Structures are given as C-alpha cells and as structure tokens.
Amino acid sequence: MGSNYFNSLNFRQKLIQLRQCTLIRKEEFSETFKILKGKNIVIVGCGSQGLNQGLNMRDSGLNVKYALRKNSIISQRSSWKRAIDNKFLVGTCEELIPTADLVINLTPDKQHEHVVDVLQNLMKKNSILGFSHGFNIIEFGQKIRQDITVIMVAPKCPGTEVREEYKRNFGVPTLISVHLDNDCHNIGLEVAKEWATAIGGHRAGVLHSSFSAEVKSDLMGEQTILCGLLQTGSVLCYDKLISQGHDCHYAVKLVQSGWEVITESLKHGGITLMFDRLSNTAKIRAYKLSNDLKKILSPIFKKHMDDILSGYYSKNMMLDWKNDDKQLKIWRRSIQNTSFEQCSISHITLLEHEYFENGLLMVAIIRAGVELAFEIMIEAGIKEESAYYESLHELPLIANTIARKRLYEMNLIISDTAEYGSHLFFQSAFPLLQDFMNTLEHGDLGNKMLDQAINNVDLNYINTTIRNHPVEHIGQKLRRYMTNIKQINCY
C-alpha cells in the first residue's frame, strides 16, 4: 500500500490545497484544441464515464481509442461491446499506450494501483496521464514517473448526464486540477482545460481545483448527503409510512419518486425554492424538523469529515478491498433485503404538488443534509464552490437514480468507493434517527398538513434565514453558468 499523499503535507500545505477552487472565466476556453487536436488519446476502461466522455471528445473532433484488458476483448465483455458498438478502435494497453499522447484512466478506484503501474511502464516519455477522480493519487499515494504530467478532469455527475447535456449543446460543471508533483513541463492546466472543453464542461462552469480538494470534498458529499442520507432517509421514511398504515405501493412511490421531484427544485432555486414550494404552515414545520435533524446528525457528519481528512476512512476501505470487499458485500445485502427494496413495483400516480404536501419530512431531510454537509466542509477548509457541488448540486442527479430502480440503481451507478461510504453512514445514522422518527406528527409524512394561523414575524425570520445561508449565496453565483440546464418531467 502506498503512503497517503495528503498526510505527507504540512498543515499549511493542506490548507492551501483544500482551499484551491477558482471558477475559470468562459473566455479562457477555446474549441480549437491547440494542444489535443490531432493527438493520440487513449481511454483506459469503458464504463459509464469512460464511454460518455469518449463520445463527447470524439464529437468535439478529437482522436479517441480505448484500451481494455486482453480478457475483456477475447471474452467480448460489456466494456468491449460498448466501445465496439460505438465504432471506437479497441486494443490492449500493450498495443495502444506506447503511442498515446494522453492516457485517461477511467477504471474503478480499487483497480488503479495495478492499472497505473501497467500504464507507467508503457507510456512514452513526456506523455500525460489523466484521471476523473484523485483517490489513487491522494489516498493511496501512488508515485508517477516524473516526466509524466498528471491531470484531472472531474465532471460533477454520472457519465450518462455528461453525454446527455453535451447532446443538448450544454455540459455539466467540472473540476480540473494538475498534480503539483507531476507538472514538469507546465502544460497540465492547459491540457485539462482542453479536455474539459471537449466533454462540454466549459458551458456549465469549470473550477480550477486541486487533487486534494476534489477527493476530500467528493468523499464527504457522497458519504453524507448525496448517498448516505438519501439511503438512510429512504428506508426510514418507507418504514414510517408502513407503520402508519399506508399501502406499500403508495409508500414506495412517495419515497422512490419523491426525492427526484423535490430535489428538482434545487437545480433552479436552491433550498429557497424548495421551501417556497411548501405552504406557510408546512414551511414552518419543515424548518423546525430540519433544525432538529441538523442537531442529531451533526456528530456523524463531523466524524465522517474527520475520518476523511485523516485518511482513516480510506485506510479501512482499502483494507476491505484486500479482503474481497467482505464488509461492503455484507452491507450491500442488508440494504437489498430492506422492505423498501423488496416492495413490488408501484403503478400509483402522484401529482407533483402531492410530493411536497405529503413529503414534508423529506424536504426537511434534504435541507438538513445539504446545509450540514456544506457547513462542515467549509469548517474543514474546503472552498464554498467545492462544497456546493458536493452537497447541493449533485443531489438531484443521485435522486434520479433512486427514482429509476431505488437504492439498487443508486448503488449500481455510484462507485464502490461511494457505496462503501454510504453504507458506513447508514450504519450510524439509521439507529440514531429512530427516536426522532417516533416524534413525528400527522402531516409530517404521508398526509397533507392542515393550514394554521401564521405568525408573520416567525415566517419572515425563517425565509430570511434560509435565503441568507452561504450555500444559497454561492448557489446563485454558480447557477448562472447553468441557465440552460434541462428540467426533468419526473412525476
């Protein structure tokens, strides 16, 4: 096992890297591709990110090939089929890597140690190695040959959305970075900008970040609000609805589709718009519930952040990798056996407003999780831009996966790294929230809250507090780059 790169830095260096996150002006991007045009680009791996980034890059006029394992080619596995069906040239690493100018490693995190060792031995002098997640560099601490430039382009969404937004002549917000230990030719940033442009990221906003900031914020977001809290909230809300006597198909429909419908409002107006979709009475109640949830969940969120920063989380997960994912598989089976996952498909139709009216608790969970994750990342030294993308921005995208095939789909789409952290969060949060669930009132979940007399002073205070939260301010700034973002008819 390598030596954790982040832990090798002194305190000052850690803060500098965590705080690295600057929005790049649109004028700095060009679709002429002065560096990458005509260059030989090889993507290693053809999963969701690999395929869809490659399609976008080819449509942008770049030369893209795929390097796969020999067994994958001989056995004609799904990765080979995806590449061939889309008319890409496919070969082994031994065949394609020695002549590549840019090698993009888009294999799963747990394979990086071996894959990167193979790539380094094959890459030509002064070539470029790219990643879309910095886990291997930061947490495992793998050393890369000094003549190789190491860069990262990390789209802030699943690979399918990278492609869909590109086809709409738009893109998805993207983080780019250059590994400070591997930029001897001082070309890393310009190459990363061209790669980000080739996949359409420049149309939605590109942030110049660091490997450390991307990894630490990404791990925190996916473990807590993005995956961990949605998974915990799904099981808790479904079980509560059943205990109240609701039909299982109504319960599963409200929860499974509710996350997607409710978080759709976040894309266009943040938490402010989400709360504005509630009646005044419901807004006051949701505000109280979300504050209660923040107090309960704060210690868990802080522990996850602390363990991510120290490397304790990654160390334990990598030990589980070496144990054939034993713990991950146990947790995975446990979630698959929950009543929420086992309920048959629901054919009930609910109108959009019913999800807000009957899912008040879900609104409260979302606000609590987004604000808490954002606040704790800021406390840790992470910049507001990074914290926003890893708390609020990606939430609707993860909710979309639950709407398709519940938690099974979410855990299938996200990385094993994200899934491990999500299950770890569930183990702590689920039992901790049991007492809270027993305090819920009629109208909090499954039933519409009856309107009551409103205190204008209280309502004004709540509206002002929500709108003035830092996540709302930075959200307004960053969403200006996403005015063309598509609206999903998700109910």
From Swiss-Prot:
Function description: Involved in the biosynthesis of branched-chain amino acids (BCAA). Catalyzes an alkyl-migration followed by a ketol-acid reduction of (S)-2-acetolactate (S2AL) to yield (R)-2,3-dihydroxy-isovalerate. In the isomerase reaction, S2AL is rearranged via a Mg-dependent methyl migration to produce 3-hydroxy-3-methyl-2-ketobutyrate (HMKB). In the reductase reaction, this 2-ketoacid undergoes a metal-dependent reduction by NADPH to yield (R)-2,3-dihydroxy-isovalerate.
Keywords: Amino-acid biosynthesis, Branched-chain amino acid biosynthesis, Magnesium, Metal-binding, NADP, Oxidoreductase, Repeat
Enzyme Commission identifier(s): 1.1.1.86
Broad class of enzyme this protein falls into: oxidoreductase
GO BP annotation list: isoleucine biosynthetic process; L-valine biosynthetic process
Similarity comment: family membership: Belongs to the ketol-acid reductoisomerase family.
Domain KARI N-terminal Rossmann: 18-209
GO CC terms: cytosol
Any one GO MF annotation of this record: ketol-acid reductoisomerase activity
Binding of substrate, residues: 415
Catalysed reaction, written as an equation: (2R)-2,3-dihydroxy-3-methylbutanoate + NADP(+) = (2S)-2-acetolactate + NADPH + H(+); (2R,3R)-2,3-dihydroxy-3-methylpentanoate + NADP(+) = (S)-2-ethyl-2-hydroxy-3-oxobutanoate + NADPH + H(+)
Textual note on the cofactor: Binds 2 magnesium ions per subunit.
Annotated positions binding Mg(2+) 1: 218, 222
Record pathway: Amino-acid biosynthesis; L-isoleucine biosynthesis; L-isoleucine from 2-oxobutanoate: step 2/4; Amino-acid biosynthesis; L-valine biosynthesis; L-valine from pyruvate: step 2/4
Domain KARI C-terminal knotted: residue ranges: 210-354, 355-485
Superkingdom of the source species: Bacteria
Binding site for NADP(+): 46-49, 69, 77, 79, 109-111, 159
Listed cofactors: Mg(2+)
Positions of Mg(2+) 2 binding: 218, 390, 394
Name recorded for this polypeptide: Ketol-acid reductoisomerase (NADP(+))
